[in-house]
Swiss-Prot record:
Expressed by the venom gland. This is Long neurotoxin MS4. InterPro entries: Snake_3FTx, Snake_toxin-like_sf, Toxin_cobra-type. SUPFAM superfamilies: Snake toxin-like. It is found in: Secreted. It comes from Micrurus surinamensis (Surinam coral snake).
Amino acid sequence: LTCKTCPFNTCANSETCPAGKNICYQKKWEEHRGERIERRCVANCPKLGSNDKSLLCCRRDDCN
């Protein structure tokens, strides 16, 4: 599985997920500097936090 890894809306960077991390993840939230994005490989889909705008977990290459 490969997942996107950059903190931008348009993301060309991907990484091959290590063993045990078979979910691609993307979280968006607002800060005083504007919208922030986190993308990576995870073992479990995290819960949506109170400050999060959106949360995406998926199991296809580069789906985040």
